[in-house]
Amino acid sequence: MHSQFDVRVNLTRFEKSVCKYEEAEIREGQILFWGSSLFTRWSREYDNTPLEEMIRGKDGSQVAVNHGIGGATAEELLFYYPRMVQPWKPRALVIYAFPNDAAAGYSPFEVMALKAKLLDHARVHMPGIRFYLLGVNLRTKYLDEGSLWNTTENRMLQHNELLEDYCRRHGDCTYLPVHQSPLFYATPEDAGHYEKVRRDIFVEDGIHFNQEGYDLFAQFIRESLDDIL
């Protein structure tokens, strides 16, 4: 499944990861998390409590499936949709991608268009499915690098605006603005300002959450998905 844009990544580079997920038992009707390393690292492999254990139904039942592929772009989320999403027939889809796309040369608009195409396919195959589109996640990398940070932040904010606008126009979509949640800041007044995020909730690379970061992120997700848990 391809987009209308020039493909800027090797679409088969994550074949091993995809095959590994395909070996697992298919559980239909779950909330499927489909995205890049924000989800991949939410696992014991990275010394974090797994997503499936932290996002549970209100009755304690298992409701989530984690299909994170570290390094993936929206182009690859679309390409692998027939294998990684469609067979599971999820009742809800939580989607995250952007940083890797920007690094590969995709514009905020192109990333939004790729996500929209993925959602269009899901609507056809799974009528009534709900979508949750995560805004660009917080980070501390580049914060102290002046113009590089300004360029990075502008792209993130532009993509967030596109996500918010798309969700406003589609009743089956909910926009989840991570950067606006006070959970990730020292004071509520700092919420919404990427540059004021707490630095102690990330691992050394300044991009990925540590366990405390994932504890907060899990709370954010549970609150955001409360009506379907």
Where are these regions (language model features)?
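Serine-esterase "nucleophile elbow" of acetyl-processing enzymes
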Residues: M1-G70, E75-E76, Y80-K89
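Cell-envelope and extracellular/periplasmic
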Residues: G68-G70, V94-S107, V136, Q180-S181
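Histidine-centered active-site loop/cap adjacent to the catalytic His
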Residues: L77, R198-L229
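A short helix->loop->beta-strand "cap" motif at the edges of active sites that frequently abuts
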Residues: M126-R130
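Charged helix-capping and loop-helix junction motifs
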Residues: P108-L118, M156
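Substrate-gating cap/lid alpha-helix
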Residues: K141-Q180, E212
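Short, flexible, mixed-charge acidic loops at enzyme active sites
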Residues: Y46-E52, Y185-R199
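Generic structural signal for well-ordered alpha-helices
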Residues: Y81, K115-D120, N160-E164
